[in-house]
Structure formats: C-alpha cells, structure tokens
Amino acid sequence: MSLAVVTLKKGEGRLLKSGGMWIFDNEIATIMGSFVNGDIVLIHDFDGYPLGRGFINTNSKITVRLLTRDENQKIDEEFLEKRVRDAWEYRKKVTDTSSCRMIFGEADFLPGLVVDKFEDVLVVQSLALGIDRLKNTILELLKKVLAEDGIQIRGIYERSDAKVRKQEGMELYKGFIGPEFPTLVEIVENGVKYQVDIKDGQKTGFFLDQKYNRLAIQKLCKDARVLDCFTHTGSFALNAGIAGAKEVTGVDASQLAVDQATENAKLNGLDDKVKFICEDVFELLPKLEEEGEKYDVVILDPPAFTKSRSSVKNAVKGYREINLRGLKLVKDGGFLATCSCSHFMEYELFTKTIGQAARSAHKRLRQVEYRTQAPDHPILWASDESYYLKFYIFQVCDEK
C-alpha cells in the first residue's frame, strides 16, 4: 500500500531542512493519498524534493513529526531497534544509568515518546498519536537491549496523563503495562536515596533532569543554613543535607510532596536537620524577610510558570518576584541557585529577569556557573523544544 504524500507550501520547510523535527499545519499545501491519523507519510517540499518520513495527525497543530530523513527507510522493528540501541549506548557513555531518561522524544529521534528508567522499572509517557502505535514494540525492544546488559525490567507503568495529549485528540491514561507491581520505587542518586511515586508523583514521578545540578550545589552547602523552595520530594534539600548542611528547610505547596520529602529525609537519616513545610512560597518568602531570616544558600526550583508563548509576560513577573524575594534572604557572600524549566522562558529573557530582580534587591551577582539539563535529556540543536532547563548558581553580595 502506497503512503500518503504531504507537500509543503512554497518557501516552507526551512526549520525541517535545518534539522527540525516538526511540520505545522500552516506549512502544508496538500496531502495526497489516503491515510488515517497516526499513519506514516512521505514528506516533500513544494518542488517535490523528498524530505523524509514521519507520522501524521491532522488533529494537531504539529501535523507531521519526522521519524527519518530517508524517504525509502521502512519504519519497522529493525529501524526502531536501532533508535533504541543508539539511545541506550549514548546514555551509558554520558551518565549514571541506574536511573535515567532512556528516551527523550525528538532528541532521540522518537518524537513524542518519553521513557524513564528507575532502577528495574520503566515509566513511559506517550505524547503523540503516531508514537502511541509504536509504543509497545519500542518497550519490548528496550527490555531486550537492557537484558543484553544484564538488566531485567520487572515492571512498566504508563503515565500518559499529560494534558498535551488532548491537543493530539488523545485520551489521558495511566496504568500498568503488563503485570502489576508496587509503584513506590527506591532509587539512589548522588548518594541520596528516594522513594519515587511513579503512579501519583508529578510527571513520571521524579525530575531526573536536575541530577547533576543537585550535585553541583553540594559543595556550597557544608555547614550552611539552606532554604529550598518548591522542593517537591526534597531532592535539592537532601543533597544539601548529605553534603553537611547544618540546617535545611524545604518548602512546597503540595502536602503530598512534603510528606514524600519527609519520608525521603528519614530514609537517608537526615530528618534531624532537613525539615519540610507545606506553604505557598510566594506568601512565605515575604514573611521570612519581615522576620529578618537569612540563609547561606537559597534554592529556587519553581514549576514552569509558562507553557506557551502567550503567557510569557506573566511568567516573567513570577520569575522576577520569586528571585527578588529569594535574593533578599541570602546573606552577604551567600549563594543563590535559581532555575527555569520552561522552554518558552528563553535563556536571554531568564538572564535579564534575574538581573532586574538583583537590581531591585540591591544585590550584586557573581556568577559561579550556568548549567542546563542532565545529558540523558540531550539538547538537539535545531530542535529548540529539547532545550528547556536553565540553571544558574550565583554568589550574592550586598551593594558595596
């Protein structure tokens, strides 16, 4: 059966030709041939030049997601195994693989698919209709490739409950793939133990992208008084604790997250000096300032304040406010670790916003380092959506 052909409008396809992976609905001139959403299609530019193969979904603004630039490449099990094997071999070279992101969508050339490995458990998230059809085959291939390295996967859980699926015309879903198993999974990262709730935790249960950023703050925290804002399940706070901080306070608005963080502190024998409170950070920080509290290290790891270009302006206000409040709580010569996990809060804008907050707080910033996401979340150049995490460490000085 011949594949349908998607032909782009004249002058369109520049992003695709320069390394991008997406074709938007407004770039398409015609679709010739029969198809159902989720099918593999051929992609041509306006002049008929072949650009590759991808899967189509006319319900989505991202109408075609590229799978290969070779128009003659069959999308079969052999093709998928090569993708899976390449992804695993890459991670073995660049990161600790006991717990890691095994598949990172477009950056691993499997668009719309996320797979996290937590020890001997896989958590999968499918965000595109076409990859949904291939998901089970890919998971079997992942188990095969891992088994070759002596890693037996005891269970798979699906967390396809992200709202973005609705933009693909897909239902939200979460549940077991195969036999059921306990959904609290213990992992060790940077010497810290965690209980990861893969069923009810945020996203896939744990934010693996901050792995080496958490490690980076350890050297600042010995004998320090530390405030960790938006702590989630306590990862930055616990890294501070294990590094020898004398007192750590973690703050989160979710009681579930605070309860999990408290259990994680007990798991590491740190519950005597690492404490967690359930508070709204935006309300708490002004109170701490009024009370004259000061910290050696303040960590700001907020959720994404914007998930679209249209809400960036409001997000800037949020980032400016939280950094202003955080800076005012840092002792002269202390440190601020601050980040944004929103793709739409671009590096230049985030940097500018922190600078504005520092001026308003009458603080001078000395940059210690700039970091981004862990290498198991690779940044694919020309695929801007793969670069989202911005992470700064500053020394904070009073104006002199």
Residue ranges and their predicted role:
Residues 103-116, 135-206, 215:
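Non-catalytic substrate-recognition/targeting regions of SAM-dependent transferases
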Residues 175, 179-400:
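Rossmann-like S-adenosyl-L-methionine
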Residues 60, 130-132, 202-203:
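Short, surface-exposed beta-strand-loop junctions and turns on beta-sheet-rich folds
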Residues 1-113, 117-119:
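Non-catalytic accessory regions of SAM-dependent methyltransferases
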Residues 65-74, 123-135:
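Short histidine-centered catalytic/ligand-binding loop motif
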Residues 78, 82, 86-90, 94, ...:
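A short, charged
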